[in-house]
Amino acid sequence: MGESEMKKDTIILGIETSCDETAASVVKNGREIMSNVVASQIESHKRFGGVVPEIASRHHVEQITLVLEQAITEADVTWEDIDAIAVTEGPGLVGALLVGVNAAKALAFAKKKPLVGVHHIAGHIYANRLEHEFVFPMLALIVSGGHTELVLMKEHGDYELIGETRDDAAGEAYDKVARMLKLPYPGGPQIDRLAAKGEETIEFPRAWLEADSYDFSFSGLKSAVINKIHNAKQRDLTLSAEDIAASFQASVVEVLTEKTYRAAKEYNVNQVIVAGGVAANTGLRKSLEKRFSGEDFPLYIPPIQLCTDNAAMIAAAGTISFEKGHRSLLDLNANPSLILS
């Protein structure tokens, strides 16, 4: 029997509905994307200036069947080919998560397939493995709307939290400042675009915290920006939105970059990866690439389409769990406050 006959490919169907994207994907061996379908709801939430949970859930219900069918069709696979179904079980919006979890449970039952629950942030981390194989020990900087964390990994599926935000996540701060500047939703990309046209003319605070801490804090920065805008209005002064964006972004990016660099050095890692929606930010990407250039370990940032929520990353993370023998029962429930462990 040849080696190819001995080792069968592992094909996983991934499902992601934790926030405002309904997504399904088929991934082979945790590395090869066979299909990656995403139905975004940005237009539906734009007029509200943020994600409305009830609307998000309704859209997921409308889209989930179509998205799943499209993912299977585009991958050109049958249900016989699929080894397991991986689904985001948390964290996220509970109503949104339930749509994906229930769809996954129904399919697992009907098609007699193993079910694997996946942590959303583990998914963001494993989006990187769709581009580059992991080399341990490895450091992951996770920056998204709800999370800002530094995670040390010594092997697949092993997550040691060495730093996290003590208040607002970086993405939350971006969204709140964007609303103050009356920018359309989603605010993060809008600030990134404005910042590219502005100058860092305003000295906003950097929260370094304790000397040995890898934690983050963005609430003070957010308040400083809001106060600056309010004070300017009261004095009838006109502040450049571009300069506010550039100054705000410089503060966020410097802290993220320096703490990541310091942690990478202290823990003597072989690889640094960046994950999450804010990893699409061009200011952050440039800062990290500049800081890590010339180092003897690589920095990897996934392409834009793998930074934002998608199901390929859930299938990639689910592959590792599946191969380690992890299985979820059919009473799996959505867990909006699931801890990465």
From Swiss-Prot:
GO terms for molecular function: iron ion binding; N(6)-L-threonylcarbamoyladenine synthase activity. Binds 1 Fe(2+) ion per subunit. Keywords: Acyltransferase, Cytoplasm, Iron, Metal-binding, Transferase, tRNA processing. InterPro entries: ATPase_NBD (IPR043129), Gcp-like_dom (IPR000905), KAE1/TsaD (IPR017861), TsaD (IPR022450). GO terms for cellular component: cytoplasm. It is found in: Cytoplasm. It holds the Pfam family TsaD. One of its GO terms (biological process) is tRNA threonylcarbamoyladenosine modification. Fe cation binds at H120, H124, D309. It catalyses: L-threonylcarbamoyladenylate + adenosine(37) in tRNA = N(6)-L-threonylcarbamoyladenosine(37) in tRNA + AMP + H(+). It comes from the Bacteria. Its EC number is 2.3.1.234. Its cofactor is Fe(2+). Required for the formation of a threonylcarbamoyl group on adenosine at position 37 (t(6)A37) in tRNAs that read codons beginning with adenine. Is involved in the transfer of the threonylcarbamoyl moiety of threonylcarbamoyl-AMP (TC-AMP) to the N6 group of A37, together with TsaE and TsaB. TsaD likely plays a direct catalytic role in this reaction. Belongs to the KAE1 / TsaD family. This is tRNA N6-adenosine threonylcarbamoyltransferase.
